[in-house]
Amino acid sequence: MAQDKFKRTKLHVNVGTIGHVDHGKTTLTAALTKVGAERFGGEFKAYDAIDAAPEEKARGITISTAHVEYETEVRHYAHVDCPGHADYVKNMITGAAQMDGAILVCSAADGPMPQTREHILLARQVGVPYIVVFLNKADMVDDAELLELVEMEVRELLSKYDFPGDDTPIVRGSALKALEGDQSEIGVPAIIRLAEALDTHIPNPERAIDRPFLMPVEDVFSISGRGTVVTGRVECGVIKVGDEVEIVGIRPTSKTIVTGVEMFRKLLDQGQAGDNAGLLLRGTKRDEVERGQVLAKPGSIKAHKEFEAEVYVLSKEEGGRHTPFFNGYTPQFYMRTTDITGKVCLPEGVEMVMPGDNVKVTVSLINPVAMGEGQRFAIREGGRTVGAGVVSKVIG
């Protein structure tokens, strides 16, 4: 019990492995748990246990993901590893496993491969903020110049997708050797260096409570003699009685004052991230607010109609469409608490999108919705999920 309490004092950070198939992501994940367990306690997870990743559902999509934990001197890491390429794509787009940073695993023997590139691009598109590189299988390369070359290639690739390639930590090692307990430079010490790189290169994540206030509107009702109450779950920030908020989305933005905060029918001084709250709004009529809008700190979020997004389209087996869709496809986009119709514009040279594909699209909604980059959404047809996406850029 005492140990459990002690654990909470360490800062919690979410990471994951990305990179090409067979470059050693799962072996590295196992090595991190082993070295972590030996140094700071915790549980060693063997390769087979991680590889047999259980299936989960996120936004109606089934994804195989393995979750492991390990500790460093200053942090507690929750780490995700996916068995297949398709699982990575789905994971990153749905945000099923939010990452504060990623470990890019690249084989020193092969150098960057197609999925290396695709995972870096996806990391950029979906807003993974930091990448640390592990150059794996370094024991298979005798030529020091070749190692330098591969390292340069990886740095160039990172820079190409707007990561700081020149300043990114690249650790050379062998995950397999580390698992075997090898104490040479590329064995266990390499894993320790990688853990240190995670500690120093990935900054402390910003907590939801420290961000500007935002609450998606789920329900609106009027209480006679008191006014209009809006209910929802506070997504981020803190709201106090007397605070000014903006009502954003669907209609022109308006301002009001919060005159009461309630939770479970009790009056409070404030509500914060994670709370299911009811907010009493001054001088706002019942028909001036609707589900799908958000209440937010003034100036912190704007409503947009047009945006670029990275999208994953469910396969037929996943319960998605049985046929491809084309330019001008008009499904519903489910963002936070609202379904809103939008038109899809495909990139030049892409004629159609097959179920199971991932693609970058431009979307035009019929009404503006409060959103920013990194906003996740589901794509639905008649209430059935056919895809998932994340806003990579707002246009207008």
Swiss-Prot record:
Region (G5), start-end ranges: 174-176
Reaction(s) this enzyme catalyzes, per UniProt: GTP + H2O = GDP + phosphate + H(+)
Locations listed in the record: Cytoplasm
EC number: 3.6.5.3
Residue positions binding GTP: 19-26, 81-85, 136-139
Pfam assignment, any one: GTP_EFTU_D2
Region annotation G3: where it falls in the sequence: 81-84
Renumbered residue ranges of the record's region G2: 60-64
Region called G4, residue ranges: 136-139
Region annotated G1, chain positions: 19-26
Major site of localization recorded for this protein: cytoplasm
Keywords: Cytoplasm, Elongation factor, GTP-binding, Hydrolase, Magnesium, Metal-binding, Nucleotide-binding, Protein biosynthesis
UniProt-recorded Gene Ontology molecular function terms: GTP binding; GTPase activity; guanosine tetraphosphate binding; translation elongation factor activity
Residue intervals of the tr-type G domain: 10-206
Binding site for Mg(2+): T26
A Gene Ontology term for the protein's cellular component: cytosol
Biological role: GTP hydrolase that promotes the GTP-dependent binding of aminoacyl-tRNA to the A-site of ribosomes during protein biosynthesis.
Family that this chain belongs to: Belongs to the TRAFAC class translation factor GTPase superfamily. Classic translation factor GTPase family. EF-Tu/EF-1A subfamily.
Quaternary structure annotation from Swiss-Prot or TrEMBL: Monomer.
Designated name of the protein: Elongation factor Tu
Organism: Xylella fastidiosa (strain 9a5c)
